Amino acid sequence: MRLSMREVFLTGCDTKTEWQLPWFINNFKKFAPEQELVIADFGMSEEMLSHISNFEVIPIISAEKGWFKKPRAMLETSLLYNVEKVCWLDTDCEIAGRIDHIFDLSEPQKLGMVKDRPWTRRRNDLGNWYNSGVVLIEGTPNILKSWANECLANPVIGDQEVLYLMMGGDEIKKLLFINPLPHTYNTLRLDYIDNIAVENPRIIHHTGEKGNNTIRKQL
């Protein structure tokens, strides 16, 4: 596969979450019409694959299940011809503003992620959490390869938890491997509950079942 742009956005889903994809795409087209979107197929239905036939679709054929395929999808996309930077977006992320400038914030050998303040407050036994709903990479970081391998070897709860456990509560290691991004690029549902949400976020992340209900109301 040969993509026309060096900076690409990437999302992905299977049959369980593909219902979010048309909603996600509509918002993406509204605020990022000139940007290239690649879609990772984690096991979508034939109907959905037909619906998105105008997009570049990458089948992720690996043993991981569901969201555990995310690091693998990022890894495979980063290796495509001409691609220099990749930004992963979960399908429950609502694009609410211009997002192309996020690529200006990438750092080599690091995962660009927003600090998950609600999770850090609620479950901080291993220090700061970083939310994996939006992940920015430049090139193919070694930490991404390790994360993808760990999601296959030790799939614990979710891909974000796997990365958190890999860091082992070592804040120095997090500084080495994680590039903190501004909260406007991943404002969480719980940020609103905790009254810490930024004004006019560019990406609103509707996490969990309550987030799903919010998305359904917008369909």
Identify the meaning behind each predicted range.
Residues V57-P59, K65-R123, L136-I137:
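GT-A fold catalytic core of metal-dependent nucleotide-sugar glycosyltransferases
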Residues E34-G43, C87, G112-M113, L181, ...:
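Short, hydrophobic beta-strand segments that form beta-sheet elements in well-ordered domains
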Residues E46-S53, I102-S106, V198, R216-K217:
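Short loop/helix-cap segments at secondary-structure boundaries that form the rim of catalytic
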